[in-house]
Amino acid sequence: MTLQPYIFQDEEDRIDSITYSVQAPELPFELHEARFIYGKSKNLSIYVDESGNTGGAVNSNSLWYIICLVFFENEDISEYEDELEYKFSMLGHPDHCFHTSPLIHGENCYANDSINVRRKIMRNFMSFLRQLPAKHIEICIEKKNLTEEKIYESLIKQFIDFIENNLQYFSRYSNITFYYDNGQNIVLKILEETVKDIIPEATIEYETPKHSRLLQIADLICSLKWLGIKSRTVGLSYKEEYFFMDDRHLKRDFLRIVEKKEFKQN
């Protein structure tokens, strides 16, 4: 599935496309009556991250808002994590918490790293992504002149639609946990006001990216998806294009890998 932001054609289209109130919508009867299969031994972890913001002036860096969900069945990945830690240590970043945007722009802990070192760090983390038995899905909207309330309405509608359309998938698991770093209130609000009503087995837990490679993966995927949309519309910034060299390399070496990990919806 190729991620495409929905572009409203006019104000009437914008209004007609938003049908959920600011309060969490009342769930359809069939969702309340959904029966999940108990006694399953599998556990599902869902790691959540976002790209963009819901307020402030709209410019080329804030035209879209994306929420990424990474699905992971809690398999043993310690071998992959140990290999990644060794590679990061060899590049001068032991116990490293990967963060995509500062890496691309050479900021924060990457400020003193050369472009070659930063690209190697990215390649190592992309290799880690390829090895992971994980899938992802994104919820994306084009902000345009939407208020924060309208952004919330659109996001929560898409979130509920996704879960409703994949109830059979979620029924495979006896325990489902959503992990989020509480980075933005709008995402936390969507999780808190919908998850328990639709999936009774689910819980929401706070986690920091520093202690979770899967949250760092969610950050990577979310950022790359956002850059993919940006490259097709307004174009990459100078630093972004310098890091990836050009749009072709971004698509070939990064976005294609991400696309292979996409969650296949029912």
Write out the residue ranges for each language-model feature.
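Phosphate-ester processing/binding pockets and catalytic centers
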Residues: T2-N266
